[in-house]
A protein has these predicted regions:
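Metal-dependent peptidase/peptidase-like ectodomains
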Residues: 183-289
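Bacterial Sec-dependent N-terminal signal peptides
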Residues: 1-28
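Alpha-helical metal-binding/catalytic segments enriched in His/Glu/Asp
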Residues: 113-115, 129-188, 320
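His/Asp/Glu-rich mid-to-C-terminal helical/loop segments that flank catalytic regions of hydrolases
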Residues: 291, 295-350
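Acidic/His- and Gly-rich active-site-bordering loop/insert found
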Residues: 52, 78, 103, 107-137
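N-terminal capping segment at the start of a domain
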Residues: 28-35, 39-69, 81, 85-87, ...
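A non-catalytic alpha/beta surface segment that caps or lines the substrate-entry region
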Residues: 60-117
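Second-shell loop/turn segments in exported
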Residues: 30-39, 55-65, 101-104, 141-150, ...
């Protein structure tokens, strides 16, 4: 007869094996996640950016042949990677009619470029990774290449898409859908992101967050010599959950200095209102804006690929990838909890 104590010992042993197996599985998944992040390299970013910010793109001014060529570049990349277009039917271009742009510079329609990796568990919940791919064009024979602004954010999205696709091909999610949104018309008034949020391809109420990448390839003169920082703006405006997750992910995987200088409401630059994340925030979608700060080549023809700090840019991109990974794969969805708390406080005061 098996004694009561023997049964307990067997149960304890089985439980220990189960816990050990789970820990091993988690460890293996973390190791693979790090491998996917490390597939984002300085060399790959450089190769992409030298093509995307080349003179042949003519500065990518909205609704010009150079911008159209840049859109084709993005579509070709996604198709080569086996990543689907984000529009119904698998198309990549969200057309924006000329009349939508209140600008004398826009002479024809333009388009956002959208791709998607569907979620494996909650495909109707969306993380939107955004970057604007337009720039300020050319003046005569002088081309404004826009390598940092925002070629850097654009190719960062491409590298993250490739990493997420590798993970998906190996059966590792993402559990929620990842949308790669390349917006047009940012330089003339945030038009592309405004059009998307007014005409969303995926419902905004099911959009978990927007991680916006605009200028991540250079070093702010005020940070001279610091090769381990990034400015974060807006992470705690709508969601404390998102802010805390961002901090935890950075601490665990990257250990980069997260500088919130420009997150201050009293900061005179008002960067929170000056890039595409703001059009998501207006609809109460939690956001983070990743930014390296301005420099002497901002909106100058000297913003060229040779001046990019590629190892730092790779590390910044890996941080964004890890953050998106965590949001996409966690069991509980991120919400705009600051709004909920504010509403609760108002209700309590009544």
């Amino acid at each position: 007869m098996v004694s009561h104590y023997t049964r307990i010992s067997v149960l304890i042993l089985l439980f220990s094996f189960k816990v050990s197996a789970q820990e091993t599985q988690n460890s293996d998944q973390t190791a693979k996640r790090i491998d996917f992040a490390n597939s984002i390299t300085a060399n790959d970013l450089s190769t992409l950016l030298y093509s995307f910010a080349a003179d042949s793109m003519q500065g990518r001014m909205t609704a010009t042949p150079g911008q159209k060529k840049a859109a084709e570049f993005l579509q070709n990349f996604y198709e080569t990677q086996g990543i689907s277009g984000g529009l119904p039917g698998g198309g990549f271009y969200q057309n924006i009619p000329q009349e939508y742009f209140k600008s004398k510079y826009v002479k024809t329609d333009s388009e956002n470029v959208v791709a998607i990796i569907p979620g494996s568990t909650w495909p109707q919940e969306y993380i939107v990774l955004s970057a604007h791919y337009d720039h300020v064009g050319a003046k005569g024979d002088t081309i404004y290449n826009g390598a940092d602004d925002d070629g850097s954010g654009t190719v960062a999205l491409l590298e993250m898409a490739q990493a997420f696709k590798q993970a998906a091909d190996q059966g590792m999610g993402p559990k929620r859908s990842i949308v790669f949104l390349h917006v047009t018309g940012e330089e003339i008034g945030l038009y592309g992101s405004r059009y998307y949020t007014e005409n969303p391809i995926y419902p905004l109420e099911h959009t978990v967050c927007n991680l916006n990448t605009d200028m991540i390839g250079r070093i702010d003169p005020n940070k001279a010599g610091n090769e381990n920082y990034i400015y974060l703006i807006g992470s705690d405006k709508l969601s404390q959950e998102l802010h805390d997750l961002s901090e935890q992910v950075n601490q665990e995987f990257i250990q980069m200095e997260l500088d919130y200088t420009f997150n201050d409401e009293n900061d005179p630059n008002k960067f929170y209102y000056r890039s595409d994340h703001y059009n998501f925030a207006k609809y109460n979608v939690p956001i983070i804006f990743y930014f390296n700060g301005v420099h002497e080549d901002y909106h100058q023809p000297t913003d060229t690929p040779d001046k990019i700090e590629y190892p730092l840019m790779a590390k910044r991109t890996q941080l964004i990838f890890h953050t998106a990974w965590e949001v996409a794969n966690r069991d509980q969805r991120i919400y705009a909890d600051k709004l909920e708390n504010s509403a609760s406080e108002k209700s309590d005061k009544r």
